[in-house]
């Protein structure tokens, strides 16, 4: 639709991603911290490994394909669908920031589609027993959600929209916090990471004093799906606009480079998590979505797995990948 001139307001994509990650956080919150403590080292190592693999792949393409550093950084940020990485690359590129935008636009569509297809197809190819894997994931996350006494608590509304609104406000505030990094860049969780962290925290504590903050799960699932639809519509229109023209003008080889930058870190991350870290398949896939900073893939994985528990692995790996990709983007621009 984007290729044929259909436009979507930019705020629709932003609203969609905020609704999606806030709802996911609230649903996954009760089990998140146990899973995080149990697999903390694995998630940190995996998030770092995925982005470094992408960086090394990009460096190789720069050397072998004689690709400009700013263009390569744009391709990598698109391949990893990383807006913070894209912003860091533009800042480092200075006057060449338009070249970064070209690379981002070429690699972004496959960056979204590639990870989504991977998490959908791999369980089917491996003939994974989802019921068995869900049981493993539930056991890893603490067997059962925390049990809370709700008697005597004040429910502000029956649907739990107040906790969702509180999560969104708190999440946006968290997302605005900027932490300085070497090279003059800044790290922030943004509209995707901030509401997710806020949702996990509020989903974990469940109440503040006498006020009940436990949302109705069915409502959160509805908001999660609605948010994902909005986000994908916005991302699709944005990615499709000018994609074909840019591809024809710049040459299909850049699209191939973008595909490689998506596939290599994704496959390396999957194999590393499976062979070295020995993570179960759903932990592996959830952490892979976080390491690839792919929110659409998380939505797809939740559908495939039939459980929101995979969001714990995503949320644990995502911040590590976010910081690393910002640093790697700067290095690529400066070195090549």
Annotate each PLM feature:
Residues 3, 9-39, 197-210, 220-247:
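Hydrophobic transmembrane alpha-helices of secondary-active transporters
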Residues 3, 7, 31-32, 64-66, ...:
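Transmembrane helix-loop junctions at the membrane interface of multipass transporters and ion channels
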Residues 123-164, 210-211:
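Intrinsically disordered, low-complexity non-transmembrane regions of multi-pass membrane transporters
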Residues 7-22, 70-77, 186-200, 226, ...:
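Structural signature of hydrophobic alpha-helical transmembrane segments
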Residues 61, 65-109, 277-320:
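Alpha-helical membrane segments and immediately flanking helix-loop junctions
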Residues 12-20, 38-50, 72-77, 190, ...:
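Cytoplasmic-side transmembrane-helix entry/capping segments in multi-pass membrane proteins
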Residues 30-58, 108, 241-267, 318-319:
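Entry/N-cap segments of selected transmembrane alpha helices
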Residues 1-10, 19, 150, 161-219:
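Structural signature of multi-pass alpha-helical membrane transport proteins
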């Amino acid at each position: 639709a984007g290729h044929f001139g259909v436009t979507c307001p930019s705020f629709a994509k932003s609203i969609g991603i905020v609704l999606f990650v806030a709802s996911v956080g609230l649903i996954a919150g009760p089990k998140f911290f146990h899973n995080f403590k149990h697999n903390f080292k694995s998630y940190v190592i995996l998030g770092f490994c995925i982005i470094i693999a992408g960086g090394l792949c990009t460096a190789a393409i720069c050397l072998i394909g004689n690709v400009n550093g700013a263009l390569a950084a744009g391709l990598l940020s698109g391949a990893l669908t990383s807006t913070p990485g894209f912003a860091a690359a533009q800042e480092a590129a200075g006057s060449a920031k338009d070249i970064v935008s070209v690379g981002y636009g070429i690699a972004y569509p496959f960056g979204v589609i590639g990870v989504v297809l991977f998490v959908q197809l791999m369980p089917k190819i491996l003939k994974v027993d989802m019921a068995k894997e869900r049981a493993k994931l539930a056991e890893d996350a603490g067997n059962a959600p925390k049990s809370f006494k709700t008697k005597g608590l004040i429910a502000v509304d029956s649907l739990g929209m107040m906790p969702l609104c509180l999560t969104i406000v708190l999440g946006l505030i968290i997302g605005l916090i900027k932490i300085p990094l070497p090279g003059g860049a800044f790290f922030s969780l943004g509209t995707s990471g901030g509401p997710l962290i806020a949702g996990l925290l509020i989903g974990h504590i469940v109440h503040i004093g006498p006020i009940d903050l436990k949302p109705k799960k069915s409502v959160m699932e509805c908001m999660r799906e609605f948010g994902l639809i909005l986000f994908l519509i916005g991302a699709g229109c944005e990615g499709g606009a000018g994609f074909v023209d840019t591809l024809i003008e710049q040459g299909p080889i850049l699209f191939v480079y973008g595909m490689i930058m998506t596939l290599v870190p994704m496959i390396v991350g999957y194999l590393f998590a499976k062979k070295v870290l020995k993570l179960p398949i759903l932990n592996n896939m959830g952490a892979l979505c976080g390491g690839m900073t792919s929110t659409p893939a998380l939505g797809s994985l939740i559908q495939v797995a039939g459980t929101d528990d995979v969001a714990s692995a995503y949320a644990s790996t995502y911040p590590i990948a976010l910081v690393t990709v910002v640093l790697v983007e700067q290095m690529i621009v400066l070195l090549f």
